[in-house]
Each structure stands twice: as structure tokens, then as C-alpha cells.
Amino acid sequence: MGFLWTGSWILVLVLNSGPIQAFPKPEGSQDKSLHNRELSAERPLNEQIAEAEADKIKKTYPSESKPSESNFSSVDNLNLLKAITEKETVEKAKQSIRSSPFDNRLNVDDADSTKNRKLTDEYDSTKSGLDRKVQDDPDGLHQLDGTPLTAEDIVHKIATRIYEENDRGVFDKIVSKLLNLGLITESQAHTLEDEVAEALQKLISKEANNYEEAPEKPTSRTENQDGKIPEKVTPVAATQDGFTNRENDDTVSNTLTLSNGLERRTNPHRDDDFEELQYFPNFYALLTSIDSEKEAKEKETLITIMKTLIDFVKMMVKYGTISPEEGVSYLENLDETIALQTKNKLEKNTTDSKSKLFPAPPEKSHEETDSTKEEAAKMEKEYGSLKDSTKDDNSNLGGKTDEAKGKTEAYLEAIRKNIEWLKKHNKKGNKEDYDLSKMRDFINQQADAYVEKGILDKEEANAIKRIYSSL
């Protein structure tokens, strides 16, 4: 009974609830027309504003169901800002490095706060600032106080470096770097070359004068026992005595003839000079054949004249007076002519000196058997020499002067002939060919410089000037 009562109640509830739709029905005609109107027609402005404000509110106050996503987005924004800031810092640092290499270290130290800017070095009273010179000024273009060097200081510094390293290639290396960096032009390079050459010449002359004015002291073995070797050269008289009385005086062998860097620079016939003269086979063969001490003076003079002529040809090619081919042809003729004439002259002088030192023995006669007559002849000869010693001395001095003058004229005769040959082979015919004023000035400067260095005698220099001034 109870079961039937319950079933009736369920049936009543089902009937009252209405028809149940198992599948959704499509919207009516009104809904479809509204949808088409929304697609085709523009919505009212008020609706658009309201919808935009609703979207803004949703973005401003996100739902609490996704707190982690909002946190992640804020973290990403912070990382992006940091990355941009670091990138800008790096770009600024690179620009500062490119713009001023000297301030590179200061910019890096300012950007990095963890560095102490070398406080121990700055507050160390034992250091004078020279220890940091290499670090702060690697190129050496600034003074100790940080101010940049002037043009004269740079020229003097380059000349000093060439003088210290004894290498002409130092200037070429420096100029090539400056040209590659675009810091100077070709004309400025030529101007710098002239200024450096002038400064170097003044420096060499100054050092040579200081070297000559310094007191010269002879050194012996007893003075050098403590290991201290003086830099001064022994007097010339002691050296000459060492050559003349080497077998008789044993103390001369204890005398040291030392040479410092200045003497090596002023010596015109070093190994590197011989390397330059190897391109002239005849002349080089002549130099290697001259080894005697007596001919050392002639050898120095010969090398000086040859190198002066080589520089003269280089200058003519540089100024466009002659072509490089003509310069090469001139040097070939110069090599052959000077070598041949000098060799003949030296051989003649050698035979004359040998005949004076070793005269031919006279034929024996009956008078030589008489010792009394021989002793009488010797005494008479000695008396005659003592009677008029002044005349003999004057004649000897005159003979030496004539002999030296003859050698000099022999050397310079080769120069005169080669210059005449050079004039005959002139092919340009311009009015400015063979600018003799420039040539005379150059030769005069070189001759004076060689006289100051002690390479040439004053008479030889005057003879060279006289020949070039007579052209």
C-alpha cells in the first residue's frame, strides 16, 4: 500500500514538470536576426565603451584563481628591464673604449664599483709614478702629469729611440703604423721624416761633442781588478805607442781600448754598413782586401765617400731629378770606377812604401870591404842630418801632406768623373734637372757632419765641397 502511494506521487510530479527536451532546439527567428545585425551593423558606442571598461577592470584586477601567472609576468618584465639596462651599459662602455683608449681603464673602473682603483699603488710613497707609466701610457705619448706631448716632443722622442736602438727601421715602423691608422698623411710623413732626421743629427752631434770634451784617462790592469771597467778611451798617444813599441813595452798590452754605444754609432764602417755595401761587388771586394792598419784611414775615407754618393743618388731619385733606372745605372758605373781607380792608387802607394822601407841592396864594391871607410860614411851622414834638421823636418811634413792630398784627390777624381758621366746620360732635359743648389747644400751638410764626427779631415771635407761647388 505504501509502495503504490509513493508511485502515484512520482507520476504527478512528472506530469506537472512539462515536456522534457532531449536535444536543444535552434534559436528562433528573432535571435538569428539579432545575430546578423550584430555582424553587419556597428554596435552602439555606449556598448563598446562599457565592454572596454569591463576588459580593463579584468586586466587590472585578475581573478584570484591564477595568482602564479601574474607573478610570472611581473618577474619577466623585471628581467627584461634588467637585460635592457645591462645592454645599454655594455654599449656605452664599448663606445668609450673606441672613442678614447687612454680613458678605457678609468671608465671600466667607474662602472665597476667592486674595484678599489689600485689604492695601494696610489698611496704608496715609495713609488714615484714611473712604475705606472707603462700601464697608464703604453704608447708613451703623454708626460708624467698626463698632459699630451707636443709635436717637438714626439719628434725628439722618435729620434732618441732611433739613436738608442741604432736602427733606422724604427722610424719606418712608426710611420707605417701611423699611416695605417690614418693619423697622418703622406705629406705629413715626409715632413716628419725631415724633422726627425734633423733632430737625430743634432743629438748625434751633441753626444759627440760631450764625448770629445770628456777627460780621457788611461786604464791599466791594476785599476780594473775590482771589476769596474771605465767607459773612457785611452789617449791617442798611448795607443800609438802601443802600435810602435808593442814588442818592447809589455805594459801597453794591459791598456784597454774600450768603445761605448756612441763610438759604435759614429763608426762609419760597421757590419751593417758593410751589408749595405754588399750590393756593390767591386767596391765590397776592395774593402775586404784592405786589412792593414796603415790603410785604415784610406778605408774610412773611401767608405764615407761611397756612402755619401749613394745618399746623393737616392736624393736625386727622390726629388725626381733622375729616374730609378738611371740611378741604378749610375751606381753600377760608380761601383766599377771608384773601385778600379782606388785599387790602382792603393797598389801604387803600397809599392812606393815598400820600396822606401825595403830598398834594394846595393852592389858590393871594394870600398865596402874597408870598415874604416864605412864608419866614416855613416858618421858623415849622421852629421849631415843633424846639421840641417829643420830642413829635413819641413821636407818630411811636406811630403806627408802631399801624399795625403794625393790620396784624397784620387778619391775625389772618381766623384768628378762619375758626375760628368751622370750629366752625359741625362734624358729628361728639364730646367730643374740636377738642382745643384740642393746638391751643394746636402753635400756641405754631410761633409760638416762627418768632420764633427771625426770621420773626415777638414782638408778632405773642403776638397769635397770645392768639387761640388765647381759644378
Swiss-Prot record:
Q: Kindly state which keywords UniProt assigns to this record, in alphabetical order.
A: Cleavage on pair of basic residues, Cytoplasmic vesicle, Glycoprotein, Membrane, Phosphoprotein, Proteoglycan, Secreted, Signal
Cellular component GO terms held in the UniProt record: extracellular region; secretory granule membrane; transport vesicle membrane
- Distribution of this protein across tissues and organs: Expression restricted to the brain and pituitary gland. Not detected in the adrenal gland.
Q: Where are the transmembrane segments?
A: none
Q: Which Pfam families match?
A: SGIII
- InterPro entries attached to this UniProt entry: SCG3
Name where it mostly resides.
Answer: cytoplasm
Where do the record's glycosylation annotations fall on this chain?
A: S40
Signal peptide segment: 1-22
Please provide the Gene Ontology terms (biological process) for this protein.
protein localization to secretory granule
**Amino acid composition bias (Low complexity), ranges on this chain:** 62-73
Output the superkingdom of the source species.
Eukaryota
Write down which residues bear the modification named Phosphoserine: S40, S365
UniProt biased composition (Basic and acidic residues):
28-45, 106-142, 214-231, 345-355, 363-405
Identify its membrane topology class.
Answer: Peripheral membrane protein
Subunit and interaction comment: Interacts with CHGA. Interacts with secretogranin II/SCG2. Interacts (via C-terminus) with CPE.
Q: What does this protein do?
A: Member of the granin protein family that regulates the biogenesis of secretory granules. Acts as a sorting receptor for intragranular proteins including chromogranin A/CHGA. May also play a role in angiogenesis. Promotes endothelial proliferation, migration and tube formation through MEK/ERK signaling pathway.
Q: What is this protein called?
A: Secretogranin-3
Its source organism is: Rattus norvegicus
Q: Which gene encodes it?
A: Scg3
